[in-house]
Design a protein with these regions (language model features):
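Glycine-aromatic micro-motifs
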Residues: 1-113
């Protein structure tokens, strides 16, 4: 099983949460203050640099759910899935955008979508 940190439309009560299907919700949590959330219009993205905390949820997902999320999130061509540093040493992966292409979008200072 894999742990996946979601911070946008995959969260509970958002449009793409049903993609997580049989995944097990673990908890609401936040990252360490090492990232930047940006506003892409219909959805957010995070950059692997900055000083913001990102708020989201952690799920335990099997490989089939993870593959579906990869497809929806465009991994590895749009988003890249990699380890994210969460509070209390929780280990999970999240989807990041490449900073070089997305550093001109509006920043969501609160880190909350």
């Amino acid at each position: 099983m894999n742990k996946l940190f979601v911070y946008g439309t995959l969260k509970r009560q958002y449009s793409r949460n049903s993609i997580l299907g049989a995944a097990s919700f673990i908890k609401e949590t936040q990252t360490l203050p090492l990232y930047t959330m940006i506003d892409l219009g219909a959805f957010p993205g995070i950059l692997d640099s900055g000083r913001s905390v990102i708020y989201g949820e952690v799920y335990e997902v099997d490989n089939s759910v993870l593959e579906m999320c990869d497809l929806i999130e465009g991994h590895p061509n749009f988003y890249k899935r990699k380890l994210v540093k969460l509070e209390k040493g929780i280990k999970a992966e999240a989807y990041f955008l490449p900073k070089s292409r997305y550093n001109s979008y509006p920043v969501i200072e609160s880190g909350l979508w």
